Design a protein with these regions (language model features):
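Substrate-binding/gating loop at the entrance of the active-site cleft, primarily
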Residues: 1-15
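Short, solvent-exposed loop/turn segments at secondary-structure junctions
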Residues: 2-4, 55-58, 94-96, 127-129, ...
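A short acidic (Asp/Glu
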Residues: 7-11, 60-66, 94, 98-108, ...
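Active-site phosphate-binding strand-loop segment of PLP-dependent enzymes
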Residues: 24-100
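Conserved PLP-binding catalytic core of the aspartate aminotransferase-like
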Residues: 189-220
Length: 220
């Protein structure tokens, strides 16, 4: 289960996607499959980009637990200790529809003080978080224990962004700036988004209850 466009993006860059079985037999995050896939790839190559779409994974809605993240980080730190370079991309496009905003971000504390050869990346989507889907806008945020790595990331990102799409959507940039600077507008935005989040959760709860009643298998 994954967003199919990852394939298209990788193909354009001359890379390929390798998947792992997301859920185990009891519909929990499949630690064994994840580790086995990472181990197999890093036997053949010196670096690896890992993409994890969480919280509120597309298309399943699944969110990794704190224990799931501990397993993921134990796995990548093991390979980092062997000299491998790991890029861990966390696609948080739907984070603001995954739960209480502080709780859904708590896992980010786990990425402090990682080895220098682990670069953590967060892919953020304003289009989703700001209920602005028709205006495509987002951000790529990097976290590293090395200032040199962050400086290099900044320079490469500026070059790649300019070469790929020049400048991003001006209307979206303007809206984001105004909302962040206006406390009244920001409060109104949060209220609107929270109402939509509650609606999504209510619909999801109804579906899961009725699926259980009629014996329809459903993903967690």
């Amino acid at each position: 289960w994954f967003w199919g466009t990852y394939n298209v993006i990788c193909q354009e860059l001359g890379s390929s996607v390798t998947n792992f079985q997301l859920f185990d037999e009891v519909n929990h995050f499949n630690h064994t499959a994840f580790s086995a896939s990472v181990d197999a790839l890093l036997k053949k190559q010196e670096s690896l980009l890992i993409i994890l779409n969480t919280p509120a994974h597309n298309p399943t809605g699944y969110s990794l637990s704190s224990e799931d993240w501990d397993h993921v980080l134990d796995c990548v730190k093991k390979h980092a200790a062997a000299g491998k370079k790991i890029h861990l991309l966390v696609d948080i496009a739907y984070i603001d529809f995954a739960g209480e905003k502080h709780e859904t971000r708590a896992f980010m504390q786990k990425f402090s003080n990682l080895p220098e050869n682990i670069l953590t990346l967060f892919a953020f989507s304003m289009s989703k978080a700001y209920t602005f889907y028709g205006q495509r806008c987002g951000a790529l945020i990097a976290l590293s224990s090395s200032k040199a790595v962050i400086d290099e990331f900044g320079e490469i990102s500026k070059y790649a962004a300019r070469a790929t799409w020049s400048n991003i959507n001006r209307g979206a940039m303007t809206l984001l700036t105004r909302i962040q600077q206006d406390k009244t507008a920001y409060a109104s935005y949060e209220a609107e988004r929270d109402a939509l989040y509650r609606l999504v959760q209510e619909r999801g709860d109804i579906f899961m209850q009725e699926a259980a009643q009629c014996g329809l298998p459903a993903l967690p």
